[in-house]
C-alpha cells in the first residue's frame, strides 16, 4: 500500500526533473564565474551605450553627469540585491525573476507583477536590437559601397534576423557562451572606438552645449526621453537570476560567490564603456550628436565600418541573452500548462515564431531613439531600479528609517519617477519620427 502511494509522487518528481533538464534556464548548471561576467556585460552594455552622448545632449552637463553616476550606483546596488536573494531560502534556488516575485508577493500576484514587465523588457530589447543590427549592417554597406544601389532598411533587418533563425535553436545559456563572449569583447571594442575616434577628431568647431530644441516643450520632452535612454542602458537585471541559475551551488560554496565576482567585473567594464562614451563624445560634439554616436562619426570610413561590424556581433549575442528567458517562459507554459511533450519540434516552432515576430515589429517601427526612451522608462525602470528594492523590503523587512530602509526607498522613488516620465518623451519621439516614415521603406 505504501509503495503504491509513493509511486505517483516519485513519477511526478521524475517527470518534473525531466522537464527542468529540458528547459533552457535549468538544463545546465556548470557555468564558471567568468561566464556570468561576460553574460552580464553582453546583457548590460548594449545598443544603449551608443545613445548616451545623445542623452547627455538632452540632459545637459549637470543633470547628465548626476543621472549617469546615480544610475550606475543604484543599479549596482539592486543587482547585488538580486544576487543575494537567489538562494535566500535554504535548499531552494529562485532561478527566474518571476519565481523571486512569487516568493515576495505571493504565487499569483508575483506572476502578475513580474512576468508582464519582464516580457516587455526582453521582447522590447530584442526588437530594438533587430533595429540596431539592421541599421548597422546598412551603415557598413553605405560606407564601403558608396556607388551601390540603396537597399532598404527593411531588407537589412531581415538579413540580421536570418542569423537568429539559426542561433535561436541553441538549447540553453551555456550553449551560447562563445557567442556571448564574442559579444562582450565587441561591446568594449566599439565603445572604445566611439570615444577614441571622437578624441582624435578634436572638439567640434562651434560646439554648442545649449538645449537641442527651440521650444520649452521640446526641451522638456527631450529631457524625459533622455531619462529613458539612460534607464535602457542599465537593463541586465532582467536576466541576472537566469544567468545565476547556470552556476553550480553547494552549501559550502553558494552560487552568489561566483556570481558576484562576475557582476563586479561586468560593472567595471560597464563603467569603462559608458562614462567615456557619454562624457567624451558629448564634450566633442555637443548638441549636434546623433541618437547613435556611430552615425555621427563618419570618418575614417574603415574604422567606423569596423565599429558597426562590432555592434552587429554584439547585438547578435545580446539578442540571444534576452531571448533565452522568453524561450524558457514560452516552453514552460506549453509543456507544464498546455501539456505538450518536450521535443525539438515544439522548440523549433516556438523559437522560429518568436524571431519572426520581433523581426516584423522592428521592420514596422525602426525608431532607435524613441524605442530606447519608451521601453527604458516603461519597463526597464521598474525591473531594474525599484522592483528588487520592493522585494528586499518585503522579504528582509529592514528596520524602519534605518540605512537599508532609506536606501531602498530612495531607489524606489527614483525608479517610479523614471517610470512615469520617461515613456512620455519616448512616445513623443516615436510619433514625430513616424510622421515622415513609410512602412517597409
Curated annotation (Swiss-Prot):
KW DNA damage (keyword) present: no
Entry superkingdom: Eukaryota
UniProt keyword annotations, A-Z: Amino-acid transport, Cell membrane, Membrane, Transmembrane, Transmembrane helix, Transport
Pfam families: Aa_trans
Cysteine pairs bridged by disulfides in the record: none
Cellular location(s): Cell membrane
PANTHER family, alphabetized: OS05G0424000 PROTEIN-RELATED (PTHR48017)
Function: Amino acid transporter.
Stretches in topological domain Extracellular: 54-58, 132-155, 198-222, 286-300, 371-373, 428-441
Record membrane topology: Multi-pass membrane protein
A single Gene Ontology CC term: plasma membrane
GO biological process, one term: amino acid transport
Record topology, Cytoplasmic segments: 1-32, 80-110, 244-264, 322-347, 397-406
Entry similarity comment: Belongs to the amino acid/polyamine transporter 2 family. Amino acid/auxin permease (AAAP) (TC 2.A.18.2) subfamily.
Predominant location category: membrane
Signal peptide start and end residues: none
Name the record gives this protein: Lysine histidine transporter-like 2
Chain segments annotated as transmembrane: 33-53, 59-79, 111-131, 156-176, 177-197, 223-243, 265-285, 301-321, 348-370, 374-396, 407-427
